């Protein structure tokens, strides 16, 4: 599994998230620390989004992610936070595709509003599969 092989860890750490929330003056429920290769969460709902950041890192932060963000983020059926920058857009799209992958109505909404992004993630799944980036014990929760 790519996550463990790359030396990453996943941890539920209320103190870390509380400190980060105070430091940034926002309420944080998940964070990815690339230099420490660690995903921190304080709520399960942040898990897939943070694994999206890991996947973005594994792929080397390709320029294509920035292009997709600029072209389609404004119309994508995602929360406002996902529209702040390419990193957040990619992570939220990843989570959206995992959560709604079997919901034809939700996926059609993504396809209609962000067609290039939808195609990108469909091709990515065919090429590598999401299970390569999310440990099985985490993926099985969703």
What is each stretch, according to the model?
Residues 1-142:
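Active-site-flanking segments in enzyme catalytic domains
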């Amino acid at each position: 599994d790519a996550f463990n092989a790359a030396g990453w860890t996943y941890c539920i750490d209320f103190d870390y998230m509380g400190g980060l929330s105070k430091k940034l003056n926002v309420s944080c429920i998940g964070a990815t620390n690339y230099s420490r290769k660690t995903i921190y969460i304080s709520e399960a709902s942040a898990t897939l989004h943070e694994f999206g950041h890991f996947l973005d890192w594994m792929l080397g932060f390709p320029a294509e992610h920035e292009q997709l963000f600029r072209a389609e983020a404004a119309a994508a059926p995602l929360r406002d936070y996902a529209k702040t920058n390419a990193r957040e857009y990619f992570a939220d799209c990843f989570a959206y595709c995992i959560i709604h992958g079997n919901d034809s109505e939700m996926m059609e909404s993504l396809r209609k509003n962000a067609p290039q992004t939808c195609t990108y993630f469909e091709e990515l799944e065919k090429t590598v599969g999401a299970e390569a980036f999310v440990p099985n014990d985490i993926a099985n929760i969703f």
